Amino acid sequence: MARPMITGALALAGMLSITHGAWIPIKASLAQVLLDNAWRETLYSGQSLKPWPWADTWPVARLSVPAQDKSMVVLSGANGAALAFGPAHVRTSAPPGSADNSVIVGHRDTHFAFLQKIKPGARLQLESADGAVHHYQVSDARVLHETDTDVLAATGSR
C-alpha cells in the first residue's frame, strides 16, 4: 500500500515540477503578445495603455535592430517587474525619441542578449509613442553597472 502512494506522490511531484517549469516560458510568450497589443493600441489611441489590468508599467516605445530582425516593446520604468518582460525606459532620463539622453535598460542575458553581437556602426530604430521613427547608429557598446549613472546626464543631443 505504501509503495503505490509513494509512486503516486513522486509522479504528482514530477508533473508539478514540469508544469511549473513550462509556466515561465508560457507566461513570457503571452506577455509579449499582450505587450504588442498594448503598443498597437497606444499608437492608435494616443493614450498610454497597460498591457494587463494589474500592470504597473506600459509601453513607451518600440526598439528595433533591423540587421538582426529584432524588435521589442520598451516599457516605462526600469524596475524589476518591467525588466522581467522586456527592456525599460529610465523615467529620470529624457523621453524616448527626444533630443537628449534617453536611457533604455535591459538584462543582458535575456531581452538584450542580442547586444553581444552589436558592433559600432550598427543601426537601431526607435518608434516613439507619437508614431515617429528615430534612427540611431551605435558608436559604442559596453555593459554598465546599475550604479553608473553618468549616462543619465543631459547632453542636448541624440
Say what each PLM segment does.
Residues 4-158:
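Solvent-exposed, non-transmembrane regions of membrane-associated and secreted proteins
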